[in-house]
Regions:
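Asp-box/BNR beta-propeller blade signature and adjacent active/binding-site loops
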Residues: 1-359
């Protein structure tokens, strides 16, 4: 049986819009969990306006939330090292002053350091530019911002999705602008010198037509060394697989056909996969699915929450605790006219057997 055991409030402030953990990233070390998110000013939208309820004229903070007890309680941190470069907007939202200019990365980072973190950030959702920051002490201090190359593309709109291959070797999944300059399609890139130089590896997805997009990847490496990458499309999530270390990709299936939200793909301790995402059509909320065959088939949808006030929610990121429970972080609302908050659902993924759905 799958049980959403309880929900925890991480960050909720009157008059604030807190959102988009999927853009920033999540990391865990046993029961210590760190997740990034953005906090701007709340702005009520008129009926029929399909825009986020954030004030696009006032600056937003880029924050971290840290839990030392498996997601039961949280402390909010505002690291100065994550301030955006001067004059930068993030997805159209101004940022706080005080950040450093973007520089070239000197390289030399040890990605196998157990306390290492890297977070990727963008300016514009279509063409970027993008940057990254590195921490060697679980997010207490940061180095950067460092420049993300264009890799021959018209733009890069980076979020945080990466796989550590070795001490100086990191594979990163990014969203590139399409040939028409709009978002986007997923690409794979790699550094083998600790972040100093980068090379283009592959396109993960075909290029969508017109204003359609394939963005916001979430990736895992299986015990077989194959890589699975879940990708957000307009209203659904598709899954791709590589068996040659990200050089070529094959379409696997569509695990979530109705989302309007990015995926968070997680490999569980027992080898299964967990996919979490927000649902932006009624009933609004947070959902999950499980797979025990490397993503070929998936369970029926698991309802973690169905009490959302409107579509403006989701962007999940999930980790598994040592006791096997899953901690799913997301942004949420209980009414279109109320602030957006960061919340957590702690849930039990149950036994290995589950009902399967078609690809």
């Amino acid at each position: 049986m799958f049980a959403a055991e309880h929900t925890v409030e991480v960050y909720k402030q009157p008059g604030r819009f807190a959102g988009w953990p999927a853009n920033h990233g999540i990391w865990s070390w046993g029961n210590e969990i760190v997740v990034g998110f953005e906090s701007g000013y709340f702005h009520v939208r008129r009926p029929g306006e399909h825009e986020h309820s954030i004030d696009y004229k006032q600056p937003a903070e880029h924050l971290l939330a840290r839990s030392l007890d498996g997601g039961e309680t949280w402390q909010i941190e505002e690291p100065l090292g994550l301030l955006a470069p001067p004059g930068t907007k993030v997805a159209g939202v101004p940022t706080e002053a005080g950040g450093k200019p973007v520089a070239d990365c000197p390289g030399g980072f040890d990605f196998t350091n157990p306390d290492f973190m890297v977070t990727f950030r963008m300016a514009d959702v279509d063409i970027g530019p993008s940057r990254f920051y590195c921490s060697l002490n679980r997010g207490k201090s940061w180095q950067g911002p460092f420049r993300v190359p264009l890799f021959g593309q018209k733009g890069i709109a980076a979020r945080t999705d990466y796989l550590v291959n070795g001490r100086s070797d990191l594979t990163v999944f990014l969203t590139a602008a399409k040939s028409n300059g709009h978002e986007g399609r997923v690409i794979c890139v790699r550094t083998q010198d600790g972040g100093k130089t980068w090379s283009f590896v592959s396109f993960v997805t075909p290029e969508p037509e017109g204003r359609d997009y394939a963005i916001m990847p979430s990736s895992v490496r299986l015990p077989s060394h194959a890589i699975l990458t879940a990708v957000r499309y307009q209203n659904w999530i598709d899954l791709y697989r590589s068996d040659d270390n990200a050089r070529t990709w094959a379409y696997v299936g569509r695990p979530a056909p109705d989302t309007e939200n990015p995926p968070s793909l997680l490999q569980l301790q027992d080898g299964r996969l967990a996919l979490t995402y927000g649902r932006r059509s009624a009933p609004f909320g947070i959902r999950a699915r499980l797979s025990s065959d490397e993503g070929k088939t998936w369970s029926s949808e698991i309802v973690l929450r169905n009490d959302g006030g409107c579509w403006d929610l989701g962007y999940t990121r999930s980790v598994q605790r040592p006791d096997g429970k899953i901690v799913t972080v997301y942004y949420f609302n209980d009414s279109p006219d109320h602030e957006r908050q960061i919340a957590v659902t702690i849930w039990n993924p149950g036994l290995e057997t589950h009902r399967k759905t078609e690809k």
